[in-house]
Regions:
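Short, intrinsically disordered, charge-balanced linker/junction segments flanking boundaries
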Residues: 146, 160-166
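Bacterial c-di-GMP phosphodiesterase EAL domain
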Residues: 17-144, 156-157
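Flexible, glycine-biased helix-capping/connector loops in cytosolic signal-transduction modules
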Residues: 7-10, 40-42, 147
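Conserved glycine-bearing catalytic or ligand-binding loops at nucleotide- and phosphate-handling centers
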Residues: 1-15, 20
């Protein structure tokens, strides 16, 4: 039903065993994702950004990862769309922003050279009315100047913006 709705008006789909498997997996992941934040199953991996001129680390990108105790490592390509569709992306995104800024501040407090922390935003987060206030609050909590936070928009955000303006 959701697939037919997604495809647009006057569409229909025949229910198949493959759809049942996909639907069951999606429901399983959504329920598990609801508990993942509480159970500390989400983590950030930091990918360094290197200057091509001199080889210095000039930044890091915070990459969200999910290690489920039974399912193992769940791909972001699989769980991010579920988080977006279910509304879980907002608390998860807040956790990512908060954790990444705290980590950067901790590195800077250890006398590491200042650098930029890049955090990806989904279309859902980008459209959320309270995003500017949330970012300001998190930066203030971490005592981190705003020039050290880089918000990256995914391709999905650009596609959504294109649809809005067409």
């Amino acid at each position: 039903m959701y697939r037919a709705k997604h495809d647009g008006r006057n569409c229909f789909r025949f229910f198949t065993a493959e759809m049942q498997i996909h639907s069951s997996r999606r429901l399983q992941l959504e329920n598990a994702l609801r508990r993942a934040l509480e159970r500390d199953q989400l983590s950030l991996h930091y990918q360094p950004q290197i200057s091509l001129q001199d080889g210095r680390i000039i930044g890091a990108e915070a990459l969200l990862r999910w290690q489920h105790p039974e399912l193992g490592m769940v791909s972001p390509a699989e769980f991010i769309p579920i988080a977006e569709d279910s509304g879980l992306i907002l608390p998860i995104g807040e956790w990512v922003l908060r954790t990444a800024t705290q980590q950067l501040k901790a590195w800077m407090d250890q006398d590491m050279e200042p650098m930029v922390m890049a955090v990806n935003l989904s279309a859902v987060q980008f459209r959320h009315a309270h995003l500017p206030d949330l970012v300001t609050q998190i930066l203030e909590e971490a005592k981190l100047p705003p020039q050290y936070l880089e918000l990256e928009l995914t391709e999905g955000v650009a596609m959504d913006m294109t649809k809005l303006h067409c």
